[in-house]
Amino acid sequence: MLEKEFFTEYGEASQYQIQEVVGKGSYGVVASAECPHTGGKVAIKKMTNVFEHVSDAIRILREIKLLRLLRHPDIVEIKHIMLPPCRKEFKDIYVVFELMESDLHHVLKVNDDLTPQHHQFFLYQLLRGLKFMHSAHVFHRDLKPKNILANADCKIKICDLGLARVSFTDSPSAVFWTDYVATRWYRAPELCGSFYSNYTPAIDMWSVGCIFAEMLTGKPLFPGKNVVHQLELVTDLLGTPSPITLSRIRNEKARKYLGNMRRKDPVPFTHKFPNIDPVALKLLQRLIAFDPKDRPSAEEALADPYFQGLANVDYEPSRQPISKLEFEFERRKLTRDDVRELMYREILEYHPQMLQEYLQGEENINSHFLYPSGVDQFKQEFARLEEHNDDEEEHNSPPHQRKYTSLPRERVCSSEDEGSDSVHAQSSSASVVFTPPQTPNTATGLSSQKASQVDKAATPVKRSACLMRSDSICASRCVGVSSAVS
């Protein structure tokens, strides 16, 4: 009965056996399922009436596309997207994810005996996934414990890229957003006060710092009731910003507000966080620096002494920045049917044979015009004249003489034509340097042996490796199991 209620007329549904509903929300329903053919367990996310609001449909399209382009062991993976029954009229989307048992929010809430080794390994995976994401010039923009999935073996994965954005500049900055609505408690101060018009990956690094502090203490670091209260809590700990930091704030109103704030001195972290490893506190202090220029990048944070004995650059891959061509739809106004067609095209990425047929069909469509081109008209006229001349020759009449002559005009390339080669080269160069072994057919710059080694980095080594083999810490204690998915 559950399967009939969950699935509609999607033919591929028959290969999955729904077990239970594990989540509901405004987006739809998530159910755990099992594939009888493979015996593997997955999470199927059913999104209903996707195209009712174009803005919501674009957000879903963006997230699905980003998850395909950002394949990494520390980022949740889309295994499959079911093919809609009708290309032009489908309304629902079924996305098949790898099944994760819980999320970091639940882990921190129900486990009061997490060890420093847990904290170290959780943070290492988070930063490693973020390094890969930022190297592609992608900002997550909504990092929080609920958006970090977790398993009983302490494996975590970043999820929910619905608010993520891509920067297409030479450096991953210069991005202006007016739709930023991420959770306030993990929001960087420059976003709370709209300090700048351009932001950098440092906004994600602030969120990482807040999450790290929550791991260490078991409670949110800055649980502000509103934006003003949020800034009050931040300055209570970090002190009021220095004149140099204030001078960098472009928003005059925000700069004036902070300048008029009662002078506060920073609280020593050893007082705020007693009994915490000093090495961990030094990293935390770097992550939640008030000035974004003072925060480390994900790559720099991974090199911090806190991860000594665990970090390994060979298992911390990067990738090329994402090509503009992948998100050209962001720059034009789309109708509901436009988004539906783009979504269908993205779904076909998980159906290679149909994708090939679709692309061949596009070529055929593009080769036929509603109206004949100038070349076609010339060919038709030339054929008519030849036929007419043949008739005249049969009647021994003089050949037809043209009144005017002209040379073909030289084609003038538009700026788009001139840049097509460079754009193509850019697209080709944006290949994923690392691909998880779950998708061996995906193009990758690593050998299968190397890819296997990288995936093994998901298993902690040295200090954190003891965590997995310790008799005193069982997997069920590591994670309070409560099924969750992105």
UniProtKB/Swiss-Prot annotation:
Compositional bias ranges of the Low complexity kind: 422-433
Membrane-crossing segments per the record: none
Enzyme Commission code: 2.7.11.24
Phosphotyrosine modified-residue sites: Y180
Binding site for ATP: V22, G23, K24, G25, S26, Y27, G28, V29, V30, K45
Ranges where the record places region Disordered: 386-455
UniProt GO molecular function: ATP binding; MAP kinase activity; protein serine kinase activity; protein serine/threonine kinase activity
Residues recorded with modification Phosphothreonine: T178, T183
Pfam families linked to this entry: Pkinase
Domain notes: The TXY motif contains the threonine and tyrosine residues whose phosphorylation activates the MAP kinases.
Name the UniProt record assigns to this protein: Mitogen-activated protein kinase 17
Species for this entry: Arabidopsis thaliana (Mouse-ear cress)
